[in-house]
């Protein structure tokens, strides 16, 4: 997977998550699952695991993910990919280690903001449009209510045990990017260096 595809699929889908409109009232059972998901994410200050990313063209990439709230994440892609995605709390950097190139974006412009926030909220600036019960978990479909471009993100959870399994982003062109998490576990004492921006600072793209 090339840098341009990853940048578009993993990060720049954020504008495609925007949809102006009022939040929908959820059924009590659906609201209970949303509350359960929020409580789980709020109680997960740091974690690590592996991920499998499938882009809109069907290309599959794998790697290791580290997350530390608020705002920090690192996606290390397995070889032969030379990609590295790092959020330092404010800025997300998409780097190609082989080409020594990097593009930077504000975290607030990316889907990562939904579960890296200091306070996890799915009722402020986000509209939960659907809660879908699965055999062993549930899915929450959400849209950013501050904007005009159609799109959505689907967060998938297991409920026994409660765990974030991944997310799927659908953009305005109906193209889907899926990130599946494998063996995500709580982590303590993560090296702060994991979340340092790669390569010299460059102007952040807005």
PLM segments and residue spans:
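N-terminal export leaders
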Residues: 6-11
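N-terminal signal peptide c-region/cleavage motif recognized by signal peptidases
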Residues: 20-22
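Cleaved targeting-peptide boundary
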Residues: 26-33
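A short, Trp-centered hydrophobic/proline-enriched beta-strand micro-motif
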Residues: 39-56
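Solvent-exposed strand-loop boundary residues in beta-sheet-rich modules
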Residues: 55-57, 98-100, 173
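An acidic-aromatic
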Residues: 62-114, 177, 183
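Flexible, surface-exposed loop/linker segments and immediately adjacent secondary-structure boundaries
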Residues: 99-146
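Gly/Pro-enriched, hydrophobic low-complexity segments
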Residues: 123-125, 133-206
